[in-house]
């Protein structure tokens, strides 16, 4: 009996070791949410696993409210780095909270600290033999009175693109593709992608809710679908394992 148990544990360990981990680091637009059956808010990495078969394991380490600075200072990056193994992937999407100039624990200058933090994630992932993928911040639903979607992220997406170019990192330009998504829905229907409820309309909220940054489950699934579609399009041999494991 003991031999049987030991053999079972060995097989389980070997099977898990053969799986490829995808670590997701970022902010609330990516993060898992509590009580997902009731909570309308979802991060896009929270709904990413169903797009892949069992050879890929999504490990979502994104946390609400984090910037590159606070993610590092709270040792969250260290906890990911210490677990990385050769062939793993690291999806990196920050920016929303790096913009918080009124908060010294989170704010980063896009051209200096933000850029250097992204480069740190890239270099240290590669040190462990893992494959980093940079993603620009998802767009906010920010239509003006003329129905024009107005950008809100300043130079953060630009610095992400430049870092990806300089260090030959696969890039998914989520800002651009989610702009197209918002525009395809239009000023009114795009509310479905986010959190818009009247008081009493949803049991999770007892007051009116109008949140144009965070995603509904519908919005999260749309964004996760964009990520997968763009991974398929990218011409990079390091992504073949991901592509072969897509459903």
Task: Give, region by region, the residue ranges found by the protein language model.
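Serine-esterase "nucleophile elbow" of acetyl-processing enzymes
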Residues: 17-62, 78-88
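Acidic/histidine-rich helix-loop elements
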Residues: 31-41, 62-71, 100-110
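Short, exposed beta-strand "edge-strand" segments with a Pro/Gly-rich flavor and a Y/T-containing core
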Residues: 18, 39-42, 64-66, 167-172, ...
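Short, flexible micro-motifs
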Residues: 29, 46, 65-68, 90, ...
